[in-house]
Swiss-Prot record:
Cofactor note text: Binds 1 divalent metal cation per subunit.
Name recorded for this polypeptide: 5'-nucleotidase SurE
Cofactor: a divalent metal cation
Principal location: cytoplasm
Organism name: Cupriavidus necator (strain ATCC 17699 / DSM 428 / KCTC 22496 / NCIMB 10442 / H16 / Stanier 337) (Ralstonia eutropha)
Phylogenetic placement of the source organism: Bacteria, Pseudomonadati, Pseudomonadota, Betaproteobacteria, Burkholderiales
Matches recorded under NCBIfam families: PRK00346.1-3 (NF001489), PRK00346.1-4 (NF001490), surE (TIGR00087)
UniProt xrefs under InterPro entries: SurE, SurE-like_Pase/nucleotidase, SurE-like_sf
Disulfide partners: none
């Protein structure tokens, strides 16, 4: 089993290190992650400048390779030129903070998994629901459990899976739930500040609260103490509007 690891918090992030340690006994692990934090980068590719790859020489990250680009850059480079042997699985994370509902459209963590899936590799994104890295050891155990299940019972086709893990001690996690994406309210307003030169700076506001956290959603499962596993697809076609659009065009 050859697993490619990536993330969006950067190669120095604790979530990547513990994920690497948890999965190392399962096979060959290749780490290619961003040099810097790229949270919220979504599926962006770097097209206006060349990219470079470096290797960490010390610490728990020794042997990790990192790219001066985005999470999608990392997986794209790995699968389209850097790795002679394609991995069997792409794993992204563990992210600091949830990726539920519409978060998946913005998340660099999910985007790294999406790139693996687009290039024909089964892919999984792991996120902790709350920030702060509390109970990261439990999240790593959950990630290993999921990957072991994938190895033991591989799906028939490439898949894209989004996993959100409650920040709880492992023994307090109630189990696993197959879920759909919930929905959020619109993001909160931008935050404005005036710098010493009198210019107005803008900070993107916090994500909106959940507005659909009903039973069966990722929000509901995580809030109840369960690990949420959501299968994702990339076809954004609104099929229910095709006939109406066709009539509108006539």
């Amino acid at each position: 089993m050859h697993i490619l690891l990536a993330n969006d918090d950067g190669y120095l992030a604790p979530g990547l290190a513990v994920l690497h340690a948890a999965l190392a006994p399962l096979g060959r692990i290749t780490v290619i992650a961003p040099e810097q934090n790229h949270s919220g980068a979504s599926n962006s590719l770097t097209l206006q400048r060349p990219l470079s790859i470096y290797e960490a020489r010390e610490g728990v990250q020794k042997g990790f390779r990192f790219v001066n680009g985005t999470p999608t850059d990392c997986v794209h480079i790995a699968l389209t030129g850097l790795l002679e042997e394609k991995p069997d699985l792409v794993v992204s994370g563990i992210n600091q903070g949830q990726n539920m509902g519409e978060d998946v459209l913005y998340s660099g963590t999910v985007a790294a998994a999406i790139e693996g899936y687009l290039l024909g590799i089964p892919s999984v994104a792991f996120s902790q629901v709350d920030k702060g890295w509390e109970h990261l050891d439990a999240a790593a155990r959950v990630a290993r459990t999921v990957v072991e299940r994938i190895i033991g019972t591989p799906p028939a086709e490439p898949f894209l899976l989004n996993v959100n893990i409650p920040n709880l001690p492992f023994e307090h996690i109630k189990g696993y739930r197959a879920t759909r994406l919930g929905k959020r309210h619109p993001s909160q307003p931008v935050i404005t500040q005036v710098n010493p030169r009198g210019d107005t700076n803008y900070w993107i506001g916090p994500a909106g609260d959940a507005r659909d956290a009903s039973e069966g959603t990722d929000f509901h499962a995580a809030a109840a103490g369960y690990v949420s596993l959501t299968p994702l697809q990339l076809d954004l076609t609104h099929r229910g509007q095709l006939d109406a659009l066709d009539q509108w065009l006539k």
